């Protein structure tokens, strides 16, 4: 299993396929979905990291969670692999990390796809905001994937949730000026019943200079990039 030492973190990542590089960024408390890599690998060299405290990457207890730090870890991994520039595809939290990379490292991103991602915490629906603010880590059942993959063990689940909660309850906080700094052509995908407010998705679409907005009918938060993302990227 490949790991890279980046920013004091022993980061797990997977690489499959040939072609132009594409960085896949998973959602919160997850790893990259198994079917995701084979979908893109026939066309791209897919690089799929797992962020701190998630998937097969251990938690660093002394370092708080912030989307910006995840973005910097991802850029450091790209540098470690000799990847100067890549398409970036992110789901949920991964899309937020992708936005951060595109804002602060525009030269690194050739194209950007986000699904179910917000630019501001207030872009979540009121119900989602309330859930994230009142999340009780001790009452959330351990995800099977976390228990199976985490080097920290299943007992660390409430600990890492408690550490993630301040980020989830307050971030991201990108301004329209931040979004206007994105140079890469961008595809924003949301479900019409997503946790992202539809009006917020429109605000993001208007603020990002080279953006397209795709609203998937009869879809909730579980929409993963598919054919619409692939046609946009190639």
Regions found by a protein language model. Give the residues of each.
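Conserved HGGG/HGGXW glycine-rich cap/lid loop of the alpha/beta-hydrolase fold
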Residues: 7-59
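Active-site loop/oxyanion-hole signature of alpha/beta-hydrolase fold enzymes
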Residues: 16, 41, 47-89
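Flexible "cap/lid" loop of the alpha/beta hydrolase fold
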Residues: 96-104, 108-143
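Active-site nucleophile elbow and catalytic-triad environment of alpha/beta-hydrolase enzymes
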Residues: 162-178
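Short beta-strand/loop motif that positions the catalytic acidic residue
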Residues: 182, 188-190
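Short alpha-helix in the alpha/beta-hydrolase fold that links the catalytic acid
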Residues: 184, 198-206
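Conserved alpha/beta-hydrolase "acid-adjacent" motif
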Residues: 195-200, 224
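Catalytic active-site module of serine/aspartate enzymes centered on a nucleophile-bearing elbow/loop
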Residues: 211-234
């Amino acid at each position: 299993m490949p790991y890279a030492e980046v920013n004091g973190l022993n980061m797990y990542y997977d690489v499959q396929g040939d072609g132009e590089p594409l960085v896949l960024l998973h959602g919160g408390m997850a790893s990259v979905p198994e079917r995701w890599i084979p979908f893109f690998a026939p066309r791209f060299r897919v690089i799929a990291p797992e962020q701190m405290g998630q998937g097969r990457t251990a938690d660093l207890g002394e370092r708080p969670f912030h989307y910006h730090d995840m973005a910097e870890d991802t850029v450091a991994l790209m540098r470690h692999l000799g990847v100067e520039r890549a398409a970036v595809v992110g789901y949920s939290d991964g899309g937020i990390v992708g936005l951060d990379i595109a804002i602060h490292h525009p030269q690194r991103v050739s194209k950007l796809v986000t699904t179910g991602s917000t630019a501001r915490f207030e872009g979540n629906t009121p119900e989602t905001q309330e859930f994230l603010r009142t999340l009780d880590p001790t009452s959330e059942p351990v995800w099977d994937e976390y228990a199976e993959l985490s080097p920290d063990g299943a007992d660390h689940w409430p600990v890492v949730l408690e550490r993630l909660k301040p980020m989830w309850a307050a971030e991201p906080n990108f301004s329209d000026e931040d979004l206007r700094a994105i140079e890469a052509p961008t595809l924003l995908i949301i479900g019409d019943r997503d946790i992202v407010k539809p009006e917020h998705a429109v605000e993001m679409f208007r603020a990002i200079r080279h953006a397209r907005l795709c609203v998937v009918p009869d879809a909730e938060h579980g929409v993963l990039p598919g054919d619409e993302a692939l046609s946009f990227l190639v």
